């Protein structure tokens, strides 16, 4: 991909967008090429590229204050743009299309700071470089406009969840990335949504520390242990964030390995075995999701799950146990769980180009709905 790919768009039936997402887990970049002018998104191509180890290490480091952050951040942003550009090329090759066939790319970037309480959120990205490499208009920086309007800037996917999954009965849509967030869909009410707490961010960090594996495949490490009820209660009671009322959001700024180690050190019970901690963390995710849904008084009939956690059968069983209602992946509703977030950012890019406000005050607490994103023409 280079500047030779720039040029007038050819005619392709429908309006095509690309959505790119790299989440809190920092394990890779997901991309979808999608047609958005029908009643439901039509995925034409999908790709998931692993995060290069050196780039992942830099992004992890940038989640904590340190020296020379500005240059490191700029270089990491360029590296992420090149990874995104590879994903775009792969999507176009799969679909047999050219850059001119695509209206825009919605590129989320990589969150390295999320402090709406201080009036900012920072997603590392180099959208100008991505536009240059891809030869396609790029929409980026989706969260800042909502924060400027007094909102949390997260979660942003509830209006997309509503467009896809709302029906005649109350339903919850749960995204299990690094952080868990839930969308509550109730007939006759605007969607509500908020973060519920850690999901894969703690599970991955603990698994990496004790097994050397980047994540707990199929929940096998957790299955070797047992849930420690006293430790679970300690983890919940020691963190004031869990008791906050929505709107609320969080991220790796709060929930990280240091957070967990500090609480394990303060735990007054016997030193737990690593596999028992993993099992307890899995229950922590499910329990805090259930607590948040119960506190909302939404009473969803079922829960649709998307994100990487939907592929963890152990975590899905814990959710069913804690929620006491049907829990199933969004695949069962016709939308692959792995691609929901990338699809959402394609949808948000379309909303930005059409100047349609996509932020929901009932979700983020913003003063009003705003058009989200900034445009970087190719």
UniProtKB/Swiss-Prot annotation:
Alphabetically ordered keywords of this record: ATP-binding, Carbohydrate metabolism, Kinase, Nucleotide-binding, Transferase
Enzyme Commission code(s) on record: 2.7.1.170
GO MF terms, alphabetically ordered: ATP binding; kinase activity; phosphotransferase activity, alcohol group as acceptor
Top-level class of the enzyme under EC nomenclature: transferase
Pfam families (UniProt xref): AnmK
Annotated positions binding ATP: 23-30
HAMAP family, per the entry: AnhMurNAc_kinase (MF_01270)
Family: Belongs to the anhydro-N-acetylmuramic acid kinase family.
Function, as annotated: Catalyzes the specific phosphorylation of 1,6-anhydro-N-acetylmuramic acid (anhMurNAc) with the simultaneous cleavage of the 1,6-anhydro ring, generating MurNAc-6-P. Is required for the utilization of anhMurNAc either imported from the medium or derived from its own cell wall murein, and thus plays a role in cell wall recycling.
Protein name, per record: Anhydro-N-acetylmuramic acid kinase
């Amino acid at each position: 991909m280079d500047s030779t790919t720039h040029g007038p768009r050819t005619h392709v039936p429908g309006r095509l967008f690309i959505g790119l997402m790299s989440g809190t887990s920092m394990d890779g970049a997901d991309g979808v090429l999608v047609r958005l002018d029908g009643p439901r998104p039509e995925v034409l191509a999908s790709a998931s590229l692993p995060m290069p180890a050196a780039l992942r290490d830099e992004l992890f480091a940038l989640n904590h204050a340190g020296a020379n952050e500005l240059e490191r951040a700029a270089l990491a942003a360029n590296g992420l743009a090149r990874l995104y550009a590879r994903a775009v090329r792969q999507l176009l090759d799969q679909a047999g299309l050219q850059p001119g066939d695509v209206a825009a790319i919605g590129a989320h970037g990589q969150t390295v700071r999320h402090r709406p309480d201080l009036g900012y959120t920072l997603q590392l990205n180099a959208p100008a470089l991505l536009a240059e490499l891809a030869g396609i208009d790029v929409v980026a920086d989706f969260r800042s406009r909502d924060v400027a309007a007094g909102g949390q800037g997260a979660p942003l996917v509830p209006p997309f969840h509503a467009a896809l999954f709302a029906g005649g009965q109350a339903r919850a849509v749960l995204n299990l990335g690094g952080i868990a967030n839930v969308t509550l869909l109730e007939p006759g009410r605007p969607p509500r949504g908020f973060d519920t707490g850690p999901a894969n961010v703690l599970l991955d960090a603990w698994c990496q520390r004790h097994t050397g594996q980047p994540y707990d495949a199929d929940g096998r490490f957790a299955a070797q242990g047992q849930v420690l009820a006293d430790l679970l209660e300690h983890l919940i009671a020691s963190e004031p964030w869990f008791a906050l009322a929505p709107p609320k959001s969080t991220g790796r700024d709060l929930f990280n390995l240091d957070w967990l180690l500090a609480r394990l050190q303060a735990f007054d019970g016997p030193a737990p075995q690593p596999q028992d901690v993993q099992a307890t963390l899995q229950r922590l995710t499910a329990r805090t999701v259930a607590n948040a849904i119960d506190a909302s008084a939404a009473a969803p009939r079922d829960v649709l799950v998307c994100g990487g956690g939907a592929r963890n059968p152990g975590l899905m069983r814990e959710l069913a146990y804690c929620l006491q209602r049907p829990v199933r992946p969004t695949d069962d509703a016709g939308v692959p769980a792995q691609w929901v977030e990338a699809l959402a950012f394609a949808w948000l890019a379309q909303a930005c180009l059409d100047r349609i406000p996509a932020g929901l005050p009932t979700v983020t607490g913003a003063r009003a709905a705003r058009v989200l994103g900034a445009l970087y023409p190719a």
